Structures are given as C-alpha cells and as structure tokens.
C-alpha cells in the first residue's frame, strides 16, 4: 500500500511539469538522433522562460488557477531537495519522490539497502575474481601436470649433465680434439648433439658393400647407377594404373658393360617399391651385382645424397651415373649427369654412353675422375665420338707409316715384317681389336643363356624349394631338436 501511494505521488509530480518546459524540450528532441534512447532535458534548477507578452490574459488565468489547485492538493516540496536537483541533471525519466515524507523514508531505506548490497556485491566480486572451487577431476589433472612437469625438468637436467660430462673414452677425445668447444660444458653438449644428428643421418652401415671379390670374379671398375628416369620410367593412368617402361638399349647397356664394371644399382626409393622393378630388369642377377636403397642414403642440407665414402671401394675406380646432381653432391668429380628419360621411343642416350664407359675399361684408366673432368660441360656421347674418331685416324696413320717402313726391308726381313703385320691389320687399331673381343664374349654369353637359360632357372627354383622345405619345422620338432625319421610301414601278415 505504501508503494502504491509513492507511485501515485510520483505520477502527479510528472504531470506537474509546465507547458513552457515542454516547449523548450521539443527542439532538442527533434535535433537528437532517433537512435538515442535517453533524451537529455534542461536542468531542473533552470527557470522556465517567462510567458510571451503577446499572450492573452484569459489564457494565463486558467493556468494560475490550475497551479493553485495543485499546490493546495499536494504538500510543498522539501527545501533540501532543490540543491540536489540543481547539482544533478534531469531527464524525462526523473521522478520527484520528495513530495511526501513517507516516500523520502522509503527512498532512504532503499538507498541504505542498496549500499549494503553494493558492499556485499563488491565482496562477491572479489570472491569471483579470486580462487574458485575446483572439481576433483580438475584437481587431479592439475596435480598430474605438475608431476609430469617435474619429471620433464628432472630429465632435462640429467640429460644436460650427461651430454656435458667430460670425455670418457679416447675415441670421443680424438674425434673432437680439434674443436674449440671440447673444453667447456656447453660446448660438449653442442658437440655431442651434433654427433648424434650426424650419426643418425649416416647410412645404415659403415660399409655398404662387402670386400671386392678375387680375380677373375671381380671387375676393375664400379658403376653406381640410379633407376628413376635413367633405366626405367613409371607413369600412372586411370585406365592402366602404374606402368613401368624400360629405356631403349637398357639390356645391352647392362649386359655389355658388366664385363668391365661391377654394377651397383643405388636408388633413393625404398626397397618395397624398387625391389619388384629390379627383379624385372635382371631376373637372373647376371648384370646387377649389388642393390642399395633409400636406407643407404644420407641427408645433407635437406638433400638425399649417396655417400661414396661408405661404398668400400676405391673412389678412383668409381663412376656415378644419375639424373639428379644432388645424388653425388659430396663427390661431384665422380658423377656423370644424364638427361632424364620420360618415355620417348627414339631415345638413344644409353647406347651413346656405351663407347665412353667401354673406353675407360679397355684403356684401364688409372683415375676415372680425371677423365670425367675432361668431359665436364659437354655432351659425353657426342664429344667422345669426336675425340675417338680423331684418335683412330691418327693411330691408323701411324700403323700405315709403320707398315711402309717395314715394307722397305721386306727383301731382307720378309718373314718378320709379315708376322708383325699379321697381328695388327692396317685398317684397325688396338682399341678396335679389344672392342671386337669383348663384343664377341658378350654375344657368346647371350647365346649360352638363350640356349640354357630355362634349365638354369629351373635348377635354381628347385634348389630354392628344397631349402624352403628344409627350413620348415613343426612345434614338436622345435622342442625335440628335429623330426624323427619315419619308419617304413610293414605289410600286415
């Protein structure tokens, strides 16, 4: 009931607003944007403008009578409230509740309650910003994180101590003897970490190939050759899937040069992708002596490199043939770069390289690196053909001149001249004779395999099956040390 009385008093105070004040408010309402929610009005302390003198007295008399009736029906406002209204700005939503003492008491009680609530609210705000209660799962997670962090810090400290300890073996001391960081704690940590990374990037084994075979099974030179876009080219299509084609002249290239070179197929592919292709290239393993895969490479500056230092061969007798210069990045003097093959049928690059590698084998070059350096920046098949033709013409001219000199003494030393000229024809050089000999040996080997290849393969397959049968063993044989021989069955009486 008290609240209803205060509300009615407030509504009457709003209705008491003068007409002149409304006239002053209208321009500001029009000038204010429509998006503004609360409209500012002049301060309650400002006096309303005086009425216009042109106004009629009759219109002012009813206003005076109305204000007199309102003043008689409502009590006079409290004097102390006027300074407060003068300090605070008024708005359309300001309500003068100072008309009755009861309303003032209600307002004071409300303000006291609000102040007490504000104090409690500030305490609650502080409580909210402070530590909040945690569930058991969150508390367990927090404890777990703290424990794991402690273990990590302890492990990091122990690892740093172990890496920075003094050299314990003479091998480590000799390995890092030339380093300036070998005498400091942090320097030893750095050296050991770099050594671990270097050991991880090294090939799988220290020696990738076994020791060379004894004569006559060994070859004087070693050819390290890649497979991707050098010997074969693989492509994929929706109709056929993956298909692999051999480069023209591949069989002759491998078969003929295997007489001079120990052919090592070294690819950057893993075994499970390159193994089936190698089985198709050389099913009888007649030409390819060894195979090395991605596991035998190492990483240098983010590149896959074939490190010849781990090949267990004399580098003066090693030739690397590849389509990627990064493969022989550590040994560029041993590498020959070949144009990649993309499946062209008219390609003759491998056939053109055969005379160059053949000449190295026939002349038994002491250091192949000097020969490769002499052909740097040239197309080797074309340049070698030009140089070989010039050398052959010069040798043929020397042979002809020698035969002419020997012919002058034919009457005296006829038999000797005929025997000397019979061993070396006038139209052939020593290189031509050696080339014919190796070519004849290659043709004879091809003929032998064409005639006896099936029988040799069948014999190898039978031997493989026999070894597999001998390897089979059951559980009883594993515990008893072998299977007992079966006794022959005796016929029933």
Swiss-Prot record:
Matches recorded under CDD domains: HAD_FCP1-like (cd07521)
Functional description taken from the UniProt entry: Essential component of the TIM23 complex, a complex that mediates the translocation of transit peptide-containing proteins across the mitochondrial inner membrane. Required to direct preproteins in transit and direct them to the channel protein TIM23, and possibly facilitates transfer of the translocating proteins from the TOM complex to the TIM23 complex.
Ranges facing Mitochondrial matrix side: 40-146
Residues annotated as transmembrane: 147-163
Name of this protein: Mitochondrial import inner membrane translocase subunit TIM50
GO biological process, one term: protein import into mitochondrial matrix
Positions of the FCP1 homology domain: 216-360
UniProt transit peptide range: 1-39
Keyword Glycoprotein in record: no
Disordered, as annotated region: 40-86, 109-138
Keywords: Membrane, Mitochondrion, Mitochondrion inner membrane, Protein transport, Transit peptide, Translocation, Transmembrane, Transmembrane helix, Transport
Location(s), subcellular: Mitochondrion inner membrane
Family designation: Belongs to the TIM50 family.
Assembly, per entry: Component of the TIM23 complex, at least composed of TIM23, TIM17, TIM50 and TIM21. Interacts with preproteins in transit.
Topology term for the membrane: Single-pass membrane protein
Organism: Mycosarcoma maydis
A Gene Ontology term for the protein's cellular component: TIM23 mitochondrial import inner membrane translocase complex
Mitochondrial intermembrane face residues: 164-493
């Amino acid at each position: 009931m008290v609240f209803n009385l205060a509300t009615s008093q407030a509504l009457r105070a709003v209705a008491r607003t003068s007409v002149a004040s409304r006239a002053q408010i209208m321009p500001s309402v029009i000038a204010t944007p429509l998006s503004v929610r609360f409209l500012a009005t002049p301060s309650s302390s400002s006096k309303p403008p005086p009425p216009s003198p042109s106004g009629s007295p009759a219109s002012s008399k009813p206003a005076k009578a109305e204000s007199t009736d309102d003043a008689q029906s409502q009590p006079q406002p409290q004097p102390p409230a006027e300074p407060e209204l003068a300090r605070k700005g008024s708005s359309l939503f300001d309500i003068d509740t100072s008309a009755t003492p009861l309303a003032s008491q209600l307002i004071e009680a409300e303000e006291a309650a609000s102040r007490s609530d504000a104090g409690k609210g500030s305490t609650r705000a502080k409580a909210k910003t402070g530590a909040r209660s945690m569930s058991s799962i969150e508390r367990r997670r927090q404890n777990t994180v703290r424990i794991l962090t402690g273990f990590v810090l302890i492990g990091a400290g122990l690892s740093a101590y172990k890496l920075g300890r003094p050299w314990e073996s003479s091998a480590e001391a000799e390995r890092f003897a030339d380093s300036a960081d070998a005498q400091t704690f942090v320097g030893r940590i750095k050296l050991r970490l770099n050594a671990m990374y270097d050991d991880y990037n090294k090939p799988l084994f220290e020696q990738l190939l076994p020791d060379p075979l004894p004569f006559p099974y060994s070859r004087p030179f070693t050819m390290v050759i890649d497979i991707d876009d050098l010997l074969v080219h693989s492509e994929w299509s929706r109709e056929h899937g993956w298909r692999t084609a051999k480069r023209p002249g591949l069989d002759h290239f491998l078969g003929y040069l295997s007489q001079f070179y120990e052919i090592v197929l070294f690819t950057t592919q893993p075994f499970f992708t390159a193994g089936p292709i190698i089985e198709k290239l050389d099913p009888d393993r007649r030409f390819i002596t060894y195979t090395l895969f991605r596991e035998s490479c190492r990483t240098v500056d983010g590149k896959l490199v074939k490190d010849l230092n781990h090949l267990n061969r004399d580098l003066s007798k090693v030739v690397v043939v590849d389509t990627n210069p990064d493969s022989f990045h550590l040994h560029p003097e041993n590498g020959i770069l070949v144009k990649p093959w993309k499946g062209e049928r008219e390609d003759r690059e491998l056939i053109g390289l055969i005379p160059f590698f053949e000449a190295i084998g026939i002349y038994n070059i002491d250091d192949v690196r000097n020969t490769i350096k002499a052909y740097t920046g040239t197309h080797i098949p074309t340049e070698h053909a030009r140089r070989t033709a010039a050398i052959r013409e010069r040798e043929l001219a020397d042979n002809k001149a020698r035969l002419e000199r020997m012919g002058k003494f034919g009457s005296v030393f006829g038999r000797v001249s005929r025997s000397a000229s019979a061993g070396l024809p006038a139209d052939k050089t020593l290189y031509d004779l050696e080339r014919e000999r190796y070519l004849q040996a290659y043709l004879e080997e091809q003929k032998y395999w064409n005639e006896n290849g099936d029988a040799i393969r069948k014999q190898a397959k039978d031997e493989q099956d026999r070894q597999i049968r001998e390897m089979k063993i059951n559980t009883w044989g594993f515990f008893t040390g072998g299977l007992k021989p079966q006794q022959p069955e005796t016929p029933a009486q």
